Curated annotation (Swiss-Prot):
Pathway stated in the Swiss-Prot or TrEMBL entry: Carbohydrate biosynthesis; 3-deoxy-D-manno-octulosonate biosynthesis; 3-deoxy-D-manno-octulosonate from D-ribulose 5-phosphate: step 2/3; Bacterial outer membrane biogenesis; lipopolysaccharide biosynthesis
Localization (cell): Cytoplasm
Broad enzyme group: transferase
Enzyme Commission number(s) of this protein: 2.5.1.55
Keyword annotations: Cytoplasm, Lipopolysaccharide biosynthesis, Transferase
GO process terms (BP): keto-3-deoxy-D-manno-octulosonic acid biosynthetic process
A Pfam family it matches: DAHP_synth_1
GO annotations of cellular component type: cytoplasm
GO molecular function: 3-deoxy-8-phosphooctulonate synthase activity
Entry's family note: Belongs to the KdsA family.
UniProt name for this protein: 2-dehydro-3-deoxyphosphooctonate aldolase
Catalytic activity: D-arabinose 5-phosphate + phosphoenolpyruvate + H2O = 3-deoxy-alpha-D-manno-2-octulosonate-8-phosphate + phosphate
């Protein structure tokens, strides 16, 4: 599958989707994107910058949602213009898709909306690549139905069916907790879609702080290493210059100054894993 100006897949190095959870300001967004670009260029990691113009799914109605669509998209367009980066952001309703698709390179669907058929169809008809997040309530094999919906809509619109990624972000485990079953990455590969692992939302504690979500960022490196060891096409991680002051999802964000070391470790592991065939292909 081609994403921007690079190819993705199990026979390629993993690509990275990374950035702040939400657009907080223009300067911080440009600075963060610039630092990530520098890191990824040094490590030769294909990179897509991500940030949200609006966080529609909030624990509390008083939580910070973002700067709004117009200002958020303007800032994301500046990331593209000033830094020459590909940009991803999430859409939350059908009416947002057209204006957002006119600015960004990749759309993302929120996990809670993965079974909304009309919404998935509309995203597929945008013509953009789409990172489809698996719901926290969904079994990994059920992602086949979601990917099939997107492919069917694309085919009916006369568009390429080879534009959809399946993203794992953990599964609900009791109240206010998520776990990551690494088998799900292999199971979702059977859809034929490139599989992405969201290493930061997977350590989220949804609603764990009452009016906001908590998180356990100390487990991000653990889960990221495990996911890369299974063989994945892409990795998703949110980061922030100062997670303690982040306006959204700070507890599970990777400190920006730790990204280089973490990514270097993951690249070494990815190269080792992909040097040899995947043994599970011969185990049935």
């Amino acid at each position: 599958m081609k994403l921007g100006d690079f190819e993705i897949g199990l026979d390629k190095p993993f690509f990275l989707i990374a950035g702040t959870c939400v657009v907080e300001s223009e300067q911080m967004t440009i600075d963060t994107a610039g630092k990530l670009k520098e890191i990824c260029a040094k490590l030769k990691i294909p990179f897509i910058y991500k940030s949200s113009y609006d966080k529609a799914n909030r624990s509390s109605g008083k939580s910070f949602r973002g700067l709004g669509m117009d200002e958020g998209l303007r800032i994301l367009s500046e990331v593209k213009r000033q830094l020459g980066l590909h940009v991803l952001t999430d859409v939350h309703s059908e009416h947002e898709i057209e204006p957002v698709a006119s600015v960004v390179d990749v759309l993302q669907t929120p996990a809670f909306l993965c079974r909304q058929t009309d919404f998935i169809h509309a995203c597929a008809r945008s013509g953009k690549p789409v990172n489809i997040k698996k719901g926290q309530f969904l079994a990994p094999h059920d992602m086949k139905n979601v990917i099939d919906k997107a492919r069917d809509a694309a085919r009916e619109a006369g568009l390429s069916e080879d534009r959809f990624m399946a993203c794992e972000r953990g599964v609900s485990f009791g109240y206010n907790n998520l776990v990551s079953d690494m088998r799900s990455l292999a199971i979702m590969r059977e859809t034929g879609a490139p599989v992405v692992f969201d290493a930061t939302h997977s350590v989220q504690l949804p609603g764990g702080q009452g009016t906001s979500s908590g998180g356990q960022r100390e487990f991000v490196p653990v889960l990221a290493r495990a996911a890369v060891a299974t063989g994945i096409a892409g990795l998703f991680m949110e980061t922030h210059p100062n997670p303690a002051e982040a306006k959204s999802d700070g507890p599970n964000a990777v400190p920006l100054h730790r990204m280089a070391d973490l990514l270097e470790t993951l690249m070494t592991l990815d190269q080792a894993v992909k040097r040899t065939p995947f043994l599970e292909n011969d185990f049935n």
